[in-house]
From Swiss-Prot:
<feature type="repeat" description="1">
    <location>
        <begin position="93"/>
        <end position="99"/>
    </location>
</feature>
<feature type="region of interest" description="Required for posterior localization in oocyte">
    <location>
        <begin position="184"/>
        <end position="203"/>
    </location>
</feature>
<feature type="modified residue" description="Phosphothreonine">
    <location>
        <position position="27"/>
    </location>
</feature>
<feature type="compositionally biased region" description="Basic and acidic residues">
    <location>
        <begin position="85"/>
        <end position="95"/>
    </location>
</feature>
<feature type="region of interest" description="Disordered">
    <location>
        <begin position="1"/>
        <end position="186"/>
    </location>
</feature>
<comment type="similarity">
    <text>Belongs to the DEAD box helicase family. DDX4/VASA subfamily.</text>
</comment>
<feature type="binding site">
    <location>
        <begin position="289"/>
        <end position="296"/>
    </location>
    <ligand>
        <name>ATP</name>
    </ligand>
</feature>
<feature type="domain" description="Helicase ATP-binding">
    <location>
        <begin position="276"/>
        <end position="453"/>
    </location>
</feature>
<dbReference type="GO" id="GO:0003724">
    <property type="term" value="F:RNA helicase activity"/>
</dbReference>
<dbReference type="GO" id="GO:0043073">
    <property type="term" value="C:germ cell nucleus"/>
</dbReference>
<dbReference type="InterPro" id="IPR001650">
    <property type="entry name" value="Helicase_C-like"/>
</dbReference>
<keyword id="KW-0460">Magnesium</keyword>
<feature type="compositionally biased region" description="Gly residues">
    <location>
        <begin position="60"/>
        <end position="83"/>
    </location>
</feature>
<keyword id="KW-0221">Differentiation</keyword>
<dbReference type="GO" id="GO:0140965">
    <property type="term" value="P:secondary piRNA processing"/>
</dbReference>
<keyword id="KW-0547">Nucleotide-binding</keyword>
<feature type="domain" description="Helicase C-terminal">
    <location>
        <begin position="477"/>
        <end position="624"/>
    </location>
</feature>
Amino acid sequence: MSDDWDDEPIVDTRGARGGDWSDDEDTAKSFSGEAEGDGVGGSGGEGGGYQGGNRDVFGRIGGGRGGGAGGYRGGNRDGGGFHGGRREGERDFRGGEGGFRGGQGGSRGGQGGSRGGQGGFRGGEGGFRGRLYENEDGDERRGRLDREERGGERRGRLDREERGGERGERGDGGFARRRRNEDDINNNNNIVEDVERKREFYIPPEPSNDAIEIFSSGIASGIHFSKYNNIPVKVTGSDVPQPIQHFTSADLRDIIIDNVNKSGYKIPTPIQKCSIPVISSGRDLMACAQTGSGKTAAFLLPILSKLLEDPHELELGRPQVVIVSPTRELAIQIFNEARKFAFESYLKIGIVYGGTSFRHQNECITRGCHVVIATPGRLLDFVDRTFITFEDTRFVVLDEADRMLDMGFSEDMRRIMTHVTMRPEHQTLMFSATFPEEIQRMAGEFLKNYVFVAIGIVGGACSDVKQTIYEVNKYAKRSKLIEILSEQADGTIVFVETKRGADFLASFLSEKEFPTTSIHGDRLQSQREQALRDFKNGSMKVLIATSVASRGLDIKNIKHVINYDMPSKIDDYVHRIGRTGRVGNNGRATSFFDPEKDRAIAADLVKILEGSGQTVPDFLRTCGAGGDGGYSNQNFGGVDVRGRGNYVGDATNVEEEEQWD
């Protein structure tokens, strides 16, 4: 199962994944596992000991209820909560707030999520059937354990105080699809009454309007920012506007310039120099630049300025700008940047993304907003319900377009761009770190007479990141990680391969007195946002993340990136280490290379290190010898394919490439 950080159209946030736990082989397991010893299927009731008796997490039988606290992973350290830092008597790792840890129920023990472990559970669109087994009397049973046998009363209607908020009854572990499955039928083939479900959604905290907080979140230019002047730039298209050299020469509104200055921006980056005049002139744009190069400001500044310069009447449910992002975290980041640049103007900025209350977001949107930032699934949900239409849309921005293609959003992108309500006279802007041929051909359906801008990659910016590669097998990784973090742990992101591995490593580090949190696709949206807040404000020194967090995380003061597990694609390596050393600042990246597992990217890794002036270890050269890899040493993430004879799409005459130094 992949890390699905994409957006679900309708989400029951507290019940997400309803018992669907996967290991490296993509096999699904009940959260409570197979009951052994005293585990009793994770003590399904009062504490909901997560994975109580499952041997495959810590290599031993969990201790049932997790000390009565509902601790994550059941018997982890005498019932201590998630990450080991909170111990006996607490209801969850954040303490008593509900969540999906102890007492609340949902998809975790007790209320119906896993239904005692060996009983079937009602996840997803009807859930898995659960494990059949025989009791001591030899009776075959499925998901109908007596209360005494399953370690606590399930109680379909817990009081709010007991479960941390109003929840759905039995089977709320899935995505709340109202259809019958095997768990609706008892052993006598009688239909089990399907009681009414209640659903609880996460409502994000209101964004701050404090100027200091709004303008202090960005990353200031570093001492190596001047290197950006040496990055090569290629521009393709007809009648291309000339680049700007200063924000003051970009014909932006005064209030936008004031907010740019408050943000600490002094000189535009190469992508901003080229993109701002193109967008201001009314042209479509396909822009290719690496993460951390200022892409977000490159499209927000001219768009917001244009809205102020040429105001149109604001109609409810008809945004004038639609910005689509592949991940929730990136959408939130763009939302915060838009609020910053539109500060003290009359422009209204809205956001819609999955894992949060649809009703709450709809209330915000129906107040009217000029700009909507959205993830694809949730945006289409609003569109399908006619809460959002595109009659007044003047700008459409597809950010991280290559990532959207990788995540399977190509059809969603087509549905948005070709929607019957889409205003014909709109500008389409596509931004990405890479533009492979496939996505350029699809873009040809949407863009007209567009300008293609490619900003040089790797060399200049990555040379600001000191890259170190260690040869470490999988059994030595934890001790090596402790050794590195003992020197300096603050502001460290550790990338791992699996969601389960992220939680396990976060728990391990917390027990070693390194305040650690994790972020991945199986965590509830409230927990994902809380994890980022804790890491940003320094209360958590270390953030464990899966590879999908390698894009979109623009966090101040990230000092160190550690590849605990190497990615399978070299592009992901570049994106990961790009979390540090941003906007001309120094950074540090450390990678654990396991020759048995990571040999396939060795040749590409050697090219990356050589291209950025880094030391290449002998063991890595040996592993990469004879392999050519798939990585190209070209300095650009994409080449305009319109000049090729077999291209079908925009028929614009393409001038010879310009190179702007």
